[in-house]
Design a protein with these regions (language model features):
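Alpha/beta-hydrolase fold catalytic core
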Residues: 131-136, 141-149, 153-161
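Gly/Ser/Thr-rich helix-start
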Residues: 5-8, 12, 50, 149, ...
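Conserved AMP-binding/adenylation subdomain of ANL enzymes
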Residues: 20-37, 44-131, 140, 161-165
Length: 172
């Protein structure tokens, strides 16, 4: 079903070739190999969740982990540290909450802001912030794919600044 942006929700038929072309694209562009881990957080009723988290992961021989509880930042962080997923796909709110809770307070402190103004120290602080963010998300991933809603501009600017590997996904 579509979300009904131009009216009421309505069913949409997706042909096999459309779904398979997306799976084939994933094989070309995303680094999942047999035995890699995927944490499924997106709804299976959402095309991206079904294609990437399930069909592509299954076809690639990855191990797919489904969260059985409502995903909170704490549950997600624990899951990522145990599972160590290769590529992560999620909605912006998950990344925003984790970054705002665990990383930004350290960098936005008085001393953090002061150190970010010192050229050589600036690079070290950004590197440490990037490494801390990578560890929160399992420390084993190549990229986080974020989509399904607008992304917080402050968090996005911060992730760009520290060189964090992410992609904003958009689909129709």
């Amino acid at each position: 079903y579509t979300s009904g942006t131009t009216g009421y929700s309505k069913g949409v038929m997706l042909p096999y070739r459309s779904i398979w072309s997306n799976v084939a694209y994933c094989f070309e562009m995303l680094p999942v190999k047999p035995g890699d881990h995927i944490v499924s957080m997106l709804p299976m009723g959402h095309v991206f969740g079904m294609v990437y988290d399930f069909l592509y992961g299954f076809s690639a021989g990855a191990h797919i982990y489904f969260l059985t509880r409502m995903p909170s930042p704490k549950i997600i962080s624990q899951s990522f540290s145990e599972i160590k997923p290769r590529v992560i796909s999620c909605v912006p709110l998950i990344v925003e909450k984790i970054i705002k809770k665990d990383i930004l307070p350290k960098v936005d402190s008085k001393i953090g802001k002061l150190l970010l103004k010192v050229p050589i120290v600036n690079d070290k602080i950004k590197s440490l912030a990037r490494q801390a963010a990578m560890e929160i998300f399992g420390g084993n991933f190549d990229e986080i794919i974020i989509g399904g809603a607008p992304f917080n501009a402050e968090v996005e600017a911060f992730l760009k600044k520290i060189g964090f590997p992410y992609t904003i996904a958009y689909g129709m």
